[in-house]
Amino acid sequence: MDARAINSREKADLKYPRNTYIIGDVQGCYRELQELLELIQFDSTKDRLGFVGDLVNRGPNSLEVLRFLKSLSSPLIVLGNHDLYLLILGYGLMPEDSYEHTLHAVLQAPDKLELLEWLRHCPLIRYEKSLSAVLVHAGLPPQWNIKESILHAEEISTALKGPHYLAFLKNLFGNEPSQWKDDLEGQDRLRYICNAFTRMRFCDAKGHLDLESEGKTNQAPSRFRPWFEWRNPQEDNVDIVFGHWAALNGQSSAPHTHALDTGCAWGYKLTAINLKTKERFSVPCQSALRM
């Protein structure tokens, strides 16, 4: 099932899809993505797809992944930290050899600018009211409720889609500020929001981010916990679907939180969840890690 097959079909009315499948961190693993779609018997005229970010990098076929996703009818996509990194590289805001990556094919593609334009119009959060679900790459910090999280994510979307998106991206990287304050302004405010939604794993009860630790939940530094252990499921009243944290191996200890990063780019597997039934589907990695 490739992009050409979907483009050749009559566009579907997906206002009321049969099933909505959310897929974990693809990270350029196009072959595994296609195998997963075969496994779930995805029908683009009846089903809807969603992705929790990190669409690209580390795997071997980021260009094919982007072209395929762009061809879909109304996919539910949120950005991850690797997707933001691609935007920074793609717009020439950082030397291509600053870090190891597998994005060279995207950066040299004739449709690069078209793909970047499409990518930067994707949000950091998707709220699906009909399914009582929120999609985010890393997580939701504890000091914000669902409505506040959505509003803060819209601040990033406004910056990415606005006339000064290059200045925003150029100054995006960094770990500070690591603590939220309501009076944060400018790039500091945007950087904290972006880090919370795309890089967070551990934080404290007030949303102070620890962006250095990447291990399992029992490896949290003093006073820090996995972000989902601070949230109140009864107050949220939604399912939170996220990726980013491969060390969780798709397991979250908190109710109504669904971890989908199962480390495909690291040689493990790619996972999807049916949002209606909560059934999971996985395929093993077939692509050797390229970095």
From Swiss-Prot:
The keyword Hydrolase applies. One of its GO terms (molecular function) is bis(5'-nucleosyl)-tetraphosphatase (symmetrical) activity. The keyword Hydrolase applies. Its EC number is 3.6.1.41. CDD domains: MPP_ApaH (cd07422). Keywords: Hydrolase. It catalyses: P(1),P(4)-bis(5'-adenosyl) tetraphosphate + H2O = 2 ADP + 2 H(+). Pfam families: Metallophos. SUPFAM superfamilies: Metallo-dependent phosphatases. Belongs to the Ap4A hydrolase family. Hydrolyzes diadenosine 5',5'''-P1,P4-tetraphosphate to yield ADP. This is Bis(5'-nucleosyl)-tetraphosphatase, symmetrical. The lineage of its organism: Bacteria, Pseudomonadati, Pseudomonadota, Gammaproteobacteria, Legionellales.
